[in-house]
Design a protein with these regions (language model features):
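Small-aliphatic-rich amphipathic alpha-helix that forms the alpha element of a beta-alpha
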Residues: 361-363, 393-417
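Short, surface-exposed loop/helix-turn segments at secondary-structure junctions
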Residues: 95, 99, 237, 304, ...
Length: 464
């Protein structure tokens, strides 16, 4: 029998509607489950069990009367710490940040509350969201439920840990270079970065998106129905549009599917990861897709230019802090950002311009193919005490080569589990579609999920 904490959100809503399970009953089980896990994982921030109980009790009464306040009434959702929730501080993962309550909900949080979801908690992030790691000077170390010695990746580290551990079905992250997809890959999840502007976000920035992190495609689609709503605070958001977020699979026959296995720079993919990606690609071919190998999009000049731009940007922000506060930043992040002081204005601009070169290359590629398959991560989840796979602040982004182009090109990109390593750690397949083809891409993901079958044996708390 499936444990309550393993049920998808779509199933929970059906049970609430039929009064076969109340939000209050579900939350008592869920809170006990979280209490067994959380001392080992450290995934949550601003977790208040009594507040959650009270909100679940109110939702129970509404369902009893047949008057839910929204389509997600009573469902739990976690929200990444970087996404503002009214009245709660946003430490940005760093002990250097002054803790001031947010004046209002950011757009994604507002949409989920309007739909009736209960914000279970915020989730942990590394300093300033600038690591693909669960290390934070404010939150501490967040660990991977599949192996507590390993990293979740980041920067949506707590969201990934919470989803893999079964802290409810719905989780929300953000992604500027892979921060939804990388931890989703390392934790066995569905992680979706939509087209830029599909989910309004505040503050907005070049390449920055919010996106769902779930165990299954149905729950990803469920979240997108309510997240992809207009909000005037995001000047980059797409025009209002009625979209079909149905979960129906579709045929891939005749699709031109590119397979990219060579990153062009950075870390080379492990052999067992390549084998899993090639096996997934063969499924597309067996179902009628036209598979072809495509050349790398990234090269060293693009990656190094982006590094120059990002570190100069963060250093400019750290200079606004006094020396005492700056000293509280995670040493790895401080050492990396401090290098921004040596980046000239000319080099910073050249680095920023590399984001447009990524965009041009991405657009050209999708003139030749309909869909792209790549590894999400080149390597297996790395040790939990590392800030990056190489743990070298002078080479911080060697692992984002497959993910970052689609932030800058603005294409929707999905990570979905396609197997496990010999050590039992998840392997992520990244599937990328042309700009604005978000609903189509998620139906492709649903199709692949059907071929792959469900994941069994989700992690259990150590005491179990």
């Amino acid at each position: 029998m499936t444990a309550l904490h393993d049920l998808p959100g779509t199933r929970l809503l059906a049970l609430f509607a039929r009064r076969e399970l109340s939000p209050g009953e579900y939350y008592e089980h869920l809170l006990a489950h979280i209490q067994r896990w959380e001392p080992h994982l450290n995934a949550l921030y601003r977790f208040d069990p009594q507040r959650v109980r009270d909100q679940a009790a109110a939702a129970t009464e509404r369902w009893r009367k047949g008057q839910p306040k929204g389509p997600l009434d009573g469902l739990p959702v976690t929200i990444k710490e970087l996404i503002a929730t009214a009245g709660e501080p946003i430490p940005l993962g760093s002990a250097a940040t002054a803790l001031q309550p947010a004046p209002c909900d950011a757009p994604p949080a507002a949409r989920l509350r309007e739909a009736g979801a209960i914000v279970l908690a915020k989730t942990t992030v590394p300093d300033f969201g600038m690591l693909s790691s669960g290390l934070s000077s404010f939150h501490g170390v967040t660990r991977n439920p599949w192996n507590l010695a390993n990293n979740t990746g980041g920067s949506s580290s707590g969201a990934a840990a919470a989803a893999a551990a079964g802290y409810g079905p719905l989780h929300l992250g953000t992604d500027i270079g892979g921060s939804v997809r990388l931890p989703a890959g390392w934790c066995g999840l569905v992680g979706f970065k939509p087209s830029l502007g599909r989910i309004p976000i505040d503050p907005y920035y070049t390449g920055r998106c919010a996106g769902p992190m779930t165990r299954c495609m149905d729950d990803c689609l469920l979240l997108m129905r309510y997240l992809a709503q207009p909000d005037a605070r995001d000047a980059t958001s797409l025009p209002p549009e009625v979209l079909d977020w149905s979960a129906e699979p579709l045929s891939v026959r005749g699709l031109r599917v590119g397979l990219q296995l060579d990153p062009g720079c950075g870390l080379q993919p492990d052999a067992e990861i390549l084998a899993a990606i090639e096996a997934a690609a063969r499924l597309f071919e067996e179902h009628g897709a036209q598979l072809r190998i495509v050349e790398p999009l990234m090269d060293r000049s693009l990656l190094d230019g982006l590094n120059d731009f990002w570190r100069a940007r963060l250093w400019s922000e750290l200079l606004l802090l006094d020396e005492t506060r700056r000293a509280r930043v995670l040493p790895y992040v401080h050492a990396w950002a401090e290098g921004g002081a040596r980046v000239s204005g000319v080099d910073a601009v050249r680095g920023f311009n590399q984001t447009f070169e990524m965009r041009r290359r991405a657009a050209r590629l999708f003139g030749e193919i309909d869909l792209l398959l790549t590894p999400t991560n080149q390597v297996e989840a790395f040790p939990a005490d590392r800030a990056s796979p190489l743990n070298d602040p002078q080479r911080p982004f060697e692992h984002i080569v497959f993910t970052v182009p689609w932030n800058m090109g603005e294409q929707p990109a999905l990570s979905i589990n396609c197997g496990f390593t010999a050590a039992g750690m998840p392997i992520g397949l990244q599937v990328v579609a042309p700009r604005f083809a978000d609903t189509w891409l998620l139906r492709i993901g649903k199709t692949y999920e059907g071929w792959r079958g469900p994941i069994h044996g989700w992690p259990r708390p150590p005491a179990d």
